[in-house]
């Protein structure tokens, strides 16, 4: 297992309709993503726990791209990965933000 941590300055304030947003299913062989409100002085943090070692540069690229598209303020993102491709990671991250902004459980 490998743990990767990232921090980005956020610009977009969001309101959580409930305590957290969870998308994906780890048992599916992909990943699960949890978004939680957190007092981070306007930042967004991302912690990735992955079974695939040695892909830090790929994760950095995917997460940096996400942070440019969605610079969320005071949000903690936790990703539990079981070998998802970068495209699936991006899709799930966008799904999590869409779910958060829609305020609907999925």
Curated annotation (Swiss-Prot):
GO terms for molecular function: acyl carrier activity. The keyword Cytoplasm applies. One of its GO terms (cellular component) is cytoplasm. Covalently binds the prosthetic group of malonate decarboxylase. HAMAP family: Malonate_deCO2ase_dsu. Subunit of malonate decarboxylase, it is an acyl carrier protein to which acetyl and malonyl thioester residues are bound via a 2'-(5''-phosphoribosyl)-3'-dephospho-CoA prosthetic group and turn over during the catalytic mechanism. This is Malonate decarboxylase acyl carrier protein. The gene is mdcC.
